[in-house]
């Protein structure tokens, strides 16, 4: 009798272990590691605020977020496999990396147009729309291949001036270098620098969206490591769906203002101004890489790629979401 009970207990315990083993992974959240350029901006906050609001958890996702100094650094983290997803990588930089054989895929648009602006110290001789720029002056961008790198190149080309391009890292570091006189012309993105403009410490030179080639094109994208994307395609589809849900919530619900204000270290009034005045929701569309033919032309002109990508290459590179 005792042996029979022992055998029954063994079967029950074994069955419980098997059930736990089988149910554990199915109920667990899938982990995605994200690298995001430029902490503190409206569009760089989406993953973190969406996770705090429980949106990604509802979609059975756990995000681990690290921040980089710009799109080039973000791109390298994805290529190396240090992270799974890169948010806000410069589109031309991604085209160049893919053309060289890097294991990277575009899984969504990130910024069609951009909120960036260019500024100088109030005592600078540089005027509106880069008037007075000389070849020995320095013009900032974050990292090689980033959206700010692309924008700086386009301004020089379309406004017909020459300056020394200088990598300055993230927005706060760039501001410090301009104010200390190390760099002549800096870039920034709201909310950074708005208080300095109001205080008369700096002057606005140009908006990136002044350029038609910027405001009508998807200048930044969300990218994934090709190997992990192929292995976990359903997880990435769920991620983009949750990311879209987070964007919708952040524009529809005023409750999103307080966490963004805390995230960026600004007042709720400034947080609302940043969202409503500088980041139209259409800028953050995920479904398309808009202006791709022109982007490829620029990639050739700026020597990111030696020649146009073939239709087969474009089909492989673009893994943008399909609407349900």
Predicted regions span which residues?
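Short, solvent-exposed loop/beta-turn-alpha elements that line the ligand-binding surface or hinge
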Residues: 58, 132, 210-215, 280-288
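Pocket-lining segment of extracytoplasmic ligand-binding domains
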Residues: 92, 172-262
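Sec/Tat signal peptide C-region and signal peptidase I cleavage site
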Residues: 24-28
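Short, glycine-/small- and polar/acidic-enriched structural segments
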Residues: 29-161, 165-168, 177-180, 184-190, ...
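Secondary-structure end/capping motifs
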Residues: 230-306
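Bacterial N-terminal signal peptides that target proteins for export
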Residues: 2-14
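Hydrophobic helical h-region of N-terminal Sec-dependent signal peptides
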Residues: 14-18, 22
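Periplasmic-binding protein-like
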Residues: 110-120, 203-229, 312-324
């Amino acid at each position: 009798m005792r042996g029979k009970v022992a055998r029954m207990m063994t079967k029950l315990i074994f069955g419980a272990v098997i059930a736990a083993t089988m149910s554990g992974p199915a109920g667990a959240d899938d982990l995605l590691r994200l690298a995001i350029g430029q902490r503190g901006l409206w569009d760089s906050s989406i993953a973190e605020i969406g996770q705090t609001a429980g949106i990604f958890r509802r979609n059975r996702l756990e995000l681990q977020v690290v921040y980089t100094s710009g799109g080039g650094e973000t791109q390298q983290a994805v290529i190396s496999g240090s992270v799974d997803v890169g948010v806000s990588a410069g589109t031309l930089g991604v085209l160049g990396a893919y053309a060289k054989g890097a294991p990277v895929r575009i899984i969504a648009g990130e910024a069609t147009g951009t909120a960036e602006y260019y500024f100088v110290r109030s005592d600078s001789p540089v005027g509106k729309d880069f008037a007075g720029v000389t070849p020995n002056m320095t013009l900032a961008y974050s990292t090689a291949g980033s959206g700010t790198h692309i924008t700086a190149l386009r301004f020089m080309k379309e406004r017909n001036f020459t300056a020394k391009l200088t990598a300055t890292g993230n927005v706060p570091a760039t501001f410090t270098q301009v104010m200390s006189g190390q760099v002549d012309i800096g870039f920034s993105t709201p909310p950074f620098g708005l208080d300095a403009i109001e205080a008369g410490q700096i002057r606005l030179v140009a908006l990136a969206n002044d350029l038609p080639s910027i405001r009508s094109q998807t200048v930044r994208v969300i990218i994934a490591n090709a190997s992990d994307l192929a292995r976990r395609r359903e997880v990435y589809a769920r991620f983009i769906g949750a990311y879209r849900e987070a964007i919708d919530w952040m524009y529809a619900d005023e409750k999103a203002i307080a966490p963004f204000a805390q995230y960026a270290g600004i007042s709720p009034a400034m947080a609302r101004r940043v969202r409503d005045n500088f980041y139209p929701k259409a800028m953050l569309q995920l479904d398309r890489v808009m202006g791709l033919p022109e982007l490829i032309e620029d990639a050739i002109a700026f020597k990111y790629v030696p020649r146009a990508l073939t239709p087969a290459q474009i089909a492989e590179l673009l893994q943008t979401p399909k609407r349900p």
